[in-house]
Structure formats: C-alpha cells, structure tokens
Amino acid sequence: YKIALFARSKKLGENEKALLNLHRNNKDLIVLGAPKYFLHENDIGKSFTKRTLKNIDKYKYSFVGEILFTHADKCNTSSIGRQHESGETYLDPSGKGVADFLVKVSSKNIPVMTHWEFYDWERDWPKFSKLFLDFPNQKFIIPHMGFGSPKQAKLILSTHDNVYMTISKKNKDKRNICDPIKQSKFGSGFLNDEKQLKDEWKEILIEYQDKLLFATDAHKKHRWKKYSKIVRIYRDILNQLPEEVSKKIAYLNAQKIYDIKNK
C-alpha cells in the first residue's frame, strides 16, 4: 500500500517538517507532495514559487499539493474564519504568477493538484481550459472531480489529455455551502439512495478509467478518524465496476502519474 500526502500550510513551510519526519519513518508507505498553501492573494507569489521549486528538488516531491484556485465557503464550525464577502476563496488561473510557476514546475515532470470547484462554470471553464492548453506537457489533477456533473467531467477529460481527476468526496452530494446559488451549481454524487452507482456516473468512470484516481481527502482529524469507513465506501463503489477498471482507479493510475516504482 501507498498513500500520497502533502502538508497544509497557512504560512510557507508550516507543517512541512512534520510530514518530512513522518515520511522518514515510513518511506515505503508515504508518497510526498509539496505543501498546499492557503494564503495566495489573487495570484501565486514569487516566494511560494521559489520555495516550492527548491523543495521539489531537495525532498524529491512526487507532486505539487493542491493549488487552491476556487473553494466555496462552507457553513460549519470547522470553517469559521474562512468565510469571505464573495462567498469563496479565489485565485485567478490566468494570473501572471500562475503562469510563471507553471513554466518552472513543468520542467520537473510531476503533476500539480488544481483545486477547482465547478460552481461558477461560465467564469472559470474558459480560463482553466486555456491554462491546460497553454501547458500541454504539465499534468493537472482536479480533486473531487471539481464537485461537478457528469457532463462537466466528460467535457474536461475529453478535451484535455493532460488533466486527471480524483474521485474523493464524490460518493454523495456536496452540502454545507453558505451561498445557496453556489450550492445549486454543484453536481450530483455517485450513489443513489440504494448506495448503487448512478448510470451516468458509472459511464464516466468506465469511459475515463485511465484518468481517475481514488483519494480520501483525509485533510483533518475528523477525516482520519473515519478513514477506514471512507475506504470501505469506495471499495463498495469500485466493486460495482469491471475489475480491470476498479484496479486502475484504485491504484494503477496513481502508480503511473506519481511515478511509483514497485519494489
């Protein structure tokens, strides 16, 4: 078994050392990613780019953890302090700093996790599509399938060969969004009331079996506490697919995209 992990940082380098220490004692288990940074302001800054590029080489990171482009504000106690007047965290994908970062990181040949939620499709799809086209040799991974619809997932995956998605948090509908308009824009979850894969999602998982990755989004203590339950839920989901498809999504695609060498 392997698990891909990255630190979550509200200041540059926060929690990075702790994860490196954890990896030092679990090298056969952990696949390291560069830290996710929460405090980008409208664009990616030079200090983030410099530090991330340096540490990709220093620590042999296999991917860049989530670049937080869009994130709708949630209405729950764990998100207090992260509400915004606009109802979202937003980092413009067409920014100069984003382009500068990708020009440099694309030479490292590792994927970049691109956290984009599809609640403002008309604004964001043209910009992200251009971004993916501008950097055809850079692999991008969209977590949670963007919480989008089958139609949106199909359009992105069929248009851009260099874009992949994780299936984390897609077992059920996205909830707890403060803005009801944004809430209404999220796509459906995978499962019906009988815990069976909806036909429209099953078609997507089979058609794009080479571009989808299992993930749990175990980013806080409450997610780790139910980690085993999350894994069981997704085993039940993948067991509803042909075996060769489930193996790709469960681990084979991750081995390829993170360049994991089996011992």
Task: Give the residues covered by each predicted segment.
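Catalytic pocket-lining loop regions of alpha/beta-barrel enzymes
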Residues: 24-28, 86-214, 242
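An N-terminally biased module of ancient metal coordination in phosphate/nucleic-acid-related enzymes
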Residues: 1-23
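Well-ordered, non-membrane alpha-helical segments in soluble/globular domains
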Residues: 12-19, 45-50, 93-99, 124-126, ...
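Mid-to-C-terminal alpha-helical segments outside catalytic/metal-binding sites
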Residues: 1-3, 199-213, 219-263
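Active-site environment of divalent metal-dependent phosphoester hydrolases
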Residues: 10-14, 39-40, 70-74, 119-124, ...
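Active-site gating/metal-coordination segments in enzymes
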Residues: 15-111
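Divalent metal-coordination and catalytic microenvironments
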Residues: 3, 32, 64, 105, ...
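Active-site-proximal beta-strand/loop segments in catalytic clefts of secreted hydrolases
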Residues: 6-9, 33-37, 66-70, 114-118, ...
